[in-house]
Amino acid sequence: MMVNIAGSKESDLPKGIATAEDMINFFNSSMANMAAHDKGTQLRFGVVINSLIYTDGVQLYHCTAGKDRTGWVTAVIQLLVGMKYDDVLQDYLLTNAYTADRVNATYQYMVSTQGEAAANIYRPVLDVREEFFKAQFDEVIKVYGSIDKYATEGLGLSDEDIEKLKEQMLVGYKSKSAS
C-alpha cells in the first residue's frame, strides 16, 4: 500500500517573507498547526498508521520532500511504540545526513531560478531542525496532553490499534489483551 500524505495540492512558498528568520518562524507555526490542528492531515496520518497495522506487505508513505509530514508521522509511530523522545529526535535529525545532496541540489536550483537572496531565505527549511520537531511536539502536547491522546483523539486510532502497532513493530511484544 502507498499513502500520499502531502495533501490535496502542492504548497506554494509563502509570499512576503523577508528573512531566513521569518521563514523559520513561519515554518514552525505551519508545522505545529499541521500536526495539532489540521484534521485532513491528521486523517492521513491515521491512515498511514492503520495501514502499517492492518495491511500485510511493504508499506510506503511519503510527502513532498519526505522530511516534514513523513518525519512527523514516523516520529509519532516511534513514540507510540515506546521510543524515548530524545532517541526519536536524534533519528529525525539523521534526515539531514541522508538528504544533504538533495538539499544542496534544491538550494542550487533555487539560486539559479530565484536568486541567491531568495534562496538564502528559504534555505533553513530545506533541512530538518530540532526546533521544527519541537514546535510540532509541543503544540500536540498542548492540545492533546500526550502522544497517546493525540493518536486516539486526533488521528482516530483506538487503544487496540496502538497495541497492534506495538505488536507489528516490536519484536517479542505481547499486547496487554493477550496476557
What kind of region is each of these model predictions?
Residues 1-60, 72-179:
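Cys-dependent protein tyrosine phosphatase-like superfamily
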